[in-house]
């Protein structure tokens, strides 16, 4: 069967998704990581926590750079005293921004994943007002590759984003984090073997 569009005959096939044959389910990337949390704060306050350098320092990392526009820099510096390349999410870029609604940024991989460290995935934050809790923050980390190292990075971030949202909650309850005295439960070094086994 063909469809005539502006004088061109376009064949219609049974593949309604128009998915190329080479892009099979077996070869597709790892599933996104989804995390959400209700935060007892206004949407504007939560938005500023993610989109200002002062906000980044209050819960996310010791230092940060935010240029809140498309293609602006978004750096989250967990170890600002380290040499370049070992300080955190350095030189990431804002891909999309809708004030108080949505922020999409590129994201690199931690240094322990050496062969993919400079590869970029994407992180999307969404913000939604809720009557029962204040603001819902949704995190989607996606765009993973297909190797075992990508799978390990995905597992790492699954736990990391939970910890980051724990920090966000904590700073609204107790004030900005003191980076020289962070409670033990707000540190994250990677998934435990038990957590990794449970996710498989």
Q: For each predicted feature, which ranges?
A:
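Hydrophobic ligand-binding cavity/cleft-lining segments
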Residues: 7, 12-65, 198-200
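Intrinsic-disorder/low-complexity, polar/charged segments enriched in Ser/Thr/Lys/Arg/Asp/Glu/Gln
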Residues: 30-36, 73, 89, 102, ...
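Short beta-edge strand/loop motif at the mouth of beta-sheet-based domains
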Residues: 34, 54-89, 187
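Hydrophobic/aromatic beta-strand elements that line small-molecule binding cavities or substrate pockets
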Residues: 35-37, 63, 89-96, 120-129
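A short, structured loop/turn motif at beta-sheet edges
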Residues: 43-44, 67-68, 95-102, 126-136, ...
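Hydrophobic pocket/interface hotspot
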Residues: 46, 56, 74-76, 94, ...
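Beta-strand/loop substructures that line and gate deep hydrophobic ligand-binding cavities in soluble
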Residues: 113-159
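A conserved amphipathic terminal alpha-helix motif
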Residues: 143-200
């Amino acid at each position: 069967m063909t469809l005539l569009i502006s004088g061109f005959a376009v064949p219609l096939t049974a593949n309604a998704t128009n998915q190329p044959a080479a892009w099979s389910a077996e070869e597709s990337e790892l599933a996104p990581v989804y995390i959400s949390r209700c935060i007892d704060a206004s949407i504007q306050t939560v938005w500023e926590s993610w989109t200002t350098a002062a906000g980044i320092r209050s819960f996310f990392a010791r230092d940060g750079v935010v240029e809140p526009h498309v293609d602006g820099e978004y750096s989250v510096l967990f170890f600002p005293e380290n040499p370049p390349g070992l300080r955190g999410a350095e030189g990431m870029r804002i891909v999309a921004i809708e004030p108080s609604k949505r922020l999409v940024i590129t994201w690199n991989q931690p240094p322990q994943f050496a062969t993919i460290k400079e590869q970029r995935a994407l992180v999307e934050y969404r913000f939604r007002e809720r009557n029962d809790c204040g603001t819902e923050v949704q995190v989607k980390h996606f765009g993973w590759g297909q190797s075992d190292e990508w799978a390990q990075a995905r597992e790492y971030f699954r736990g990391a984003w939970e910890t980051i949202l724990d920090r966000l909650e904590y700073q609204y309850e107790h004030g900005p984090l003191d980076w020289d005295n962070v409670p033990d439960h707000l540190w994250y070094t990677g998934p435990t073997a038990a957590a990794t086994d449970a996710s498989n």
